[in-house]
Amino acid sequence: MAQAGRTGYDNREIVMKYIHYKLSQRGYEWDTGDEDSAPLRAAPTPGIFSFQPESNRTPAVHRDTAARTSPLRPLVANAGPALSPVPPVVHLTLRRAGDDFSRRYRRDFAEMSSQLHLTPFTARGRFATVVEELFRDGVNWGRIVAFFEFGGVMCVESVNREMSPLVDNIALWMTEYLNRHLHTWIQDNGGWDAFVELYGPSMRPLFDFSWLSLKTLLSLALVGACITLGAYLGHK
């Protein structure tokens, strides 16, 4: 596998492809507006991204229109040093880890989804509260996997509640958080290449508690008029 060097891989690409994968599991197609992605599908209503059941996909439209308007494009323009393309094995390993996490905590995720009560006005607060709690005691690969899976849950719930434009924002928040708060830790710990080497298909199980070193509790607490969602991780 190609080495990313000190600058690392493009976090935006990792986020976008992960969200696309999670939505596709539920039968939704997400048009990212990425110039390097597959051709875009026509949206049923004006917008940056479109969500359609796979059985109702419409013919492709020119990708440049959505690419110019995507709120994520400034992250690329201001990314600084050139980032390395993300090897497919990184996406595959992260997806497998996320799926394993989701299976282990299926009941918790189902409860969380039903109680998120996302709206365009509350989504940012929900995201910030969970992520702050998730990494309060430090960073490890298990918490990074949980971070991606939580973002996927928020995106799926947004689409289920007919608020698909929120996915634009969630993808942006995830990318910004990775760039500002997690990128240094990832690079200091061998980068995504190390994640693949440690937890890839030929190595130990992707979600073995021996490497995750945590027990996850996803809980919701009502405080006044606001719901505070916490992802509490405790060491074994």
Curated annotation (Swiss-Prot):
**Where, per the database record, does this protein carry Phosphothreonine?**
69
GO cellular component: a single term? nucleus
Question: What drives induction of this protein's expression?
Answer: Down-regulated by lipopolysaccharides.
Tell me where in this chain the PTM Phosphoserine is found: 70, 84
Q: Which domain of life is it from?
A: Eukaryota
Q: Which UniProt keywords apply?
A: Apoptosis, Autophagy, Cytoplasm, Endoplasmic reticulum, Membrane, Mitochondrion, Mitochondrion outer membrane, Nucleus, Phosphoprotein, Transmembrane, Transmembrane helix, Ubl conjugation
Sequence motif BH1, location on chain: 133-152
Q: Where is this site: Cleavage?
A: 34-35
Where is the motif BH4 annotated in this sequence?
Answer: 10-30
Any one biological process term the GO annotation gives: ovarian follicle development
Protein modification: Phosphorylation/dephosphorylation on Ser-70 regulates anti-apoptotic activity. Growth factor-stimulated phosphorylation on Ser-70 by PKC is required for the anti-apoptosis activity and occurs during the G2/M phase of the cell cycle. In the absence of growth factors, BCL2 appears to be phosphorylated by other protein kinases such as ERKs and stress-activated kinases. Phosphorylated by MAPK8/JNK1 at Thr-69, Ser-70 and Ser-84, which stimulates starvation-induced autophagy. Dephosphorylated by protein phosphatase 2A (PP2A). Proteolytically cleaved by caspases during apoptosis. The cleaved protein, lacking the BH4 motif, has pro-apoptotic activity, causes the release of cytochrome c into the cytosol promoting further caspase activity.
Record localization? Mitochondrion outer membrane; Nucleus membrane; Endoplasmic reticulum membrane; Cytoplasm
Q: Which GO terms describe its molecular function?
A: BH domain binding; BH3 domain binding; channel activity; channel inhibitor activity; DNA-binding transcription factor binding; identical protein binding; molecular adaptor activity; protease binding
Motif BH3, per the record, lies over 90-104
Q: Where is the chain membrane-spanning?
A: 209-230
Its record classes its membrane topology as: Single-pass membrane protein
SUPFAM superfamilies hit by this protein: Bcl-2 inhibitors of programmed cell death (SSF56854)
| Function, in words | Suppresses apoptosis in a variety of cell systems including factor-dependent lymphohematopoietic and neural cells. Regulates cell death by controlling the mitochondrial membrane permeability. Appears to function in a feedback loop system with caspases. Inhibits caspase activity either by preventing the release of cytochrome c from the mitochondria and/or by binding to the apoptosis-activating factor (APAF-1). Also acts as an inhibitor of autophagy: interacts with BECN1 and AMBRA1 during non-starvation conditions and inhibits their autophagy function.
- Quote the record's domain comment: The BH4 motif is required for anti-apoptotic activity and for interaction with RAF1 and EGLN3. BH1 and BH2 domains are required for the interaction with BAX and for anti-apoptotic activity.
Please give the family membership noted in the entry.
Answer: Belongs to the Bcl-2 family.
Subunit: Forms homodimers, and heterodimers with BAX, BAD, BAK and Bcl-X(L). Heterodimerization with BAX requires intact BH1 and BH2 motifs, and is necessary for anti-apoptotic activity. Component of the complex, at least composed of LRPPRC, BECN1 and BCL2; the interactions prevent BECN1 from forming an autophagy-inducing complex with PIK3C3. Interacts with EI24. Also interacts with APAF1, BBC3, BCL2L1, BNIPL, MRPL41 and TP53BP2. Binding to FKBP8 seems to target BCL2 to the mitochondria and probably interferes with the binding of BCL2 to its targets. Interacts with BAG1 in an ATP-dependent manner.
Name of protein = Apoptosis regulator Bcl-2
- Origin species: Rattus norvegicus (Rat)
Encoding gene per record:
Bcl2
